[in-house]
């Protein structure tokens, strides 16, 4: 995996997503890497998150690793996707600093660092995840 650990929470912006952008699997929390675009010295990443479960996720923090074209880990990110209401599709943006989009080969969801609903911590969030990519860069876990 990539060298260097960055545990700063990525700044996530919420944007209304069109329903056609990502239809998730029933009963799953689908996370799609939809697009990467250059943003200065960073690579802006667009995640489409579709909560097709009945779980009102109050907090979801992913343990995300960024791999370069040589298969070497560039960065570790604790990605806070924030609230993910059931039956909703949302877009989250985050910047991967100091790396060009063309240098990224793969994003690995290594696990779930934190997952909470209104009743507190949940242990099943990782099992609910379905990962996919439309960005020409693998998103797997």
Where are the predicted features?
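Terminal connector regions
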Residues: 28, 98-141
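Short solvent-exposed strand-capping/beta-turn motif centered on an Asx-Ser/Thr pair
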Residues: 50-54
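Hydrophobic beta-strand segments
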Residues: 62-64
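Bacterial N-terminal signal peptides that target proteins for export
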Residues: 1-8
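Short acidic/proline- and small/hydrophobic-mixed sequence motifs that coincide with surface turns
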Residues: 56-59
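Intrinsically disordered, low-complexity Pro/Gly/Ser/Thr-rich segments with frequent PxxP/GP/PP motifs
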Residues: 67-105, 115
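Low-complexity, acidic Ser/Thr/Pro/Gly-rich terminal tails and inter-domain linkers that flank the onset
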Residues: 22-48, 126-139
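N-terminal signal peptide c-region/cleavage motif recognized by signal peptidases
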Residues: 16-19
